[in-house]
Amino acid sequence: RDELLTMAENCDVIAHEPPKTFWQALQLCYFIQLILQIESNGHSVSFGRMDQYLYPFYRRDVELNQSLDREHAIELLHSCWLKLLEVNKIRSGSHSKASAGSPLYQNVTIGGQNLVSGQAMDAVNPLSYAILESCGRLRSTQPNLSVRYHAGMSNDFLDACVQVIRCGFGMPAFNNDEIVIPEFIKLGIEPQDA
């Protein structure tokens, strides 16, 4: 009951103002994703770099205020991933067989680099680890999980990624920042956005 009341309070807040907590921010991300799926007959709609834009909320609640513990944050991520599985798009039987059901190819990206004062800095943070751990524990087909790899990535995070890959459910995928970023820049994307 308390959890449902908190979810209802979160809905009241995020309907009229910016989220204040990690839970509210994650709930808002889910609602936005759901709206995009409904409005555009969604397919391959990405959450983007979730560990970057949700980290200020996670940091405040889990690391600074300790109003939310890490395990509960991972449980909230589990709930979000499970809710994503409820969204379905009718497909042919052959597609469903080849794709382990009817995935919508919703992608979450973690890791990579951020441009800070013109210098590329490793962007891995504690939420990157929590998202990775959540996906590794749940072993679900959705969301697809991608890691932006670069040579400056810590061995600890790389090892954590390899441990999840060893679970055998095909994630995370790796994208190479050192290849992809220059190509985005060639297309006219600003370096801080590439």
Residue ranges and their predicted role:
Residues 1-194:
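Conserved catalytic cores of very large enzyme subunits
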